[in-house]
Every structure is written in C-alpha cells, then in structure tokens.
C-alpha cells in the first residue's frame, strides 16, 4: 500500500469535490445567505421605520386629542356663557314685563278709584239734592231736620 498514492488520490478527490462545491453549491448557498441577510436587514429597517412612524402617529394623535379637549372645553365655556347671557336677558325681560304689568295694574286701579269717586260724588250730589228737596218741602223744624239728616246718613 502506497501512502503517497493514496494521499495524492485523496487530494485529487478533495480538490474535485472542492471545485464542485465552489462552482455549483457554494454560490447559491452564499446567494441565499446574502438574500436572507438582506431580508433581515430590510425587515429591521422597516421595523425601525414603522416604530418611528408609530411614534410620530402617537404624537399626532396626542396633539389632536389635546386640541380636541381644548376646543371642547372652549365650546363648553362658550355655551355656558351664551346660556348665562340668555338667562340674564330672559330675567331682564321678565323684570321689565313684571314692571309694565304692575304699572298697568296701578294705572287701572287708579282709574277705577277715580270712577268710584266720581260715582260716589254723583250719588252724594243726588242724595243731597233729595235731602234738600225733602227739607224744603216740609216746614222748618229742628227735630225733623235732625231726623232727615240721620236718614241721609243711613242711606250714605
């Protein structure tokens, strides 16, 4: 057995195997590894980009929520202010209307009092004329005059 011939034969087989692997197996394997590394790198970049976009979107959402809260609070304050102004206006209108009604009622009461006074004057005048007629129709007598005046007082 020749050790050198075996060694040379093994070296020839090794180099043929190395050449086959280097020519046919290694390039697709390296290409697959490179593609996988590129996909991983692209995935990491996309994840970083997505994370950045998510943070930006979260900031925008937070800003929009803050603006919405501020706008909502402002609208509530404006609505409360308008409601208060409306309530004050209604109150003022009601007070003015009440004052007008009271003034009108006072005027009507005064007119009615004037009418009642005029009516009483007319009645007193009629009674005075009647009393004078009765006094003049009868003879002049103090007792009769006193009785007639008492009778007139009762009628009044």
From Swiss-Prot:
Location(s), subcellular: Cell inner membrane
Membrane topology recorded in Swiss-Prot or TrEMBL: Single-pass membrane protein
Primary location: membrane
Regions crossing the membrane: 7-27
Keywords, in A-Z order: ATP synthesis, Cell inner membrane, Cell membrane, CF(0), Hydrogen ion transport, Ion transport, Membrane, Transmembrane, Transmembrane helix, Transport
Organism: Ralstonia nicotianae (strain ATCC BAA-1114 / GMI1000)
Assembly notes: F-type ATPases have 2 components, F(1) - the catalytic core - and F(0) - the membrane proton channel. F(1) has five subunits: alpha(3), beta(3), gamma(1), delta(1), epsilon(1). F(0) has three main subunits: a(1), b(2) and c(10-14). The alpha and beta chains form an alternating ring which encloses part of the gamma chain. F(1) is attached to F(0) by a central stalk formed by the gamma and epsilon chains, while a peripheral stalk is formed by the delta and b chains.
Disulphide bridges, residue numbers: none
Family in the record: Belongs to the ATPase B chain family.
CDD domains to which the protein is assigned, alphabetical: ATP-synt_Fo_b
Molecular function (Gene Ontology), one example: proton-transporting ATP synthase activity, rotational mechanism
A Pfam family recorded for this sequence: ATP-synt_B
Protein name: ATP synthase subunit b 1
Cellular component terms per the entry's GO annotation: plasma membrane; proton-transporting ATP synthase complex
Role noted for this protein: F(1)F(0) ATP synthase produces ATP from ADP in the presence of a proton or sodium gradient. F-type ATPases consist of two structural domains, F(1) containing the extramembraneous catalytic core and F(0) containing the membrane proton channel, linked together by a central stalk and a peripheral stalk. During catalysis, ATP synthesis in the catalytic domain of F(1) is coupled via a rotary mechanism of the central stalk subunits to proton translocation. Component of the F(0) channel, it forms part of the peripheral stalk, linking F(1) to F(0).
Tagged with keyword Cell membrane: yes
The gene coding this protein: atpF
């Amino acid at each position: 057995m020749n050790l050198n011939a075996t060694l040379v034969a093994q070296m020839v087989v090794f180099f043929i195997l190395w050449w086959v692997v280097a020519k046919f197996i290694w390039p697709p394997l390296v290409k697959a590894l490179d593609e996988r590394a590129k996909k991983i790198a692209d995935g990491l970049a996309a994840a970083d980009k997505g994370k950045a976009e998510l943070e930006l979107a979260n900031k925008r959402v937070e800003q929009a929520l803050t603006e919405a809260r501020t706008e909502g609070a402002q609208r509530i304050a404006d609505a409360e202010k308008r409601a208060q102004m409306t309530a004050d206006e209604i109150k003022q209108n009601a007070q003015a209307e009440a004052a007008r009604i009271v003034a009108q009622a006072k005027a009507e009461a005064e007119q009615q009092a004037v009418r009642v006074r005029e009516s009483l004057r007319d009645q007193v005048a009629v009674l005075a004329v009647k009393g004078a007629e009765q006094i003049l129709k009868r003879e002049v007598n103090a007792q009769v005059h006193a009785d007639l005046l008492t009778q007139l007082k009762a009628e009044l």
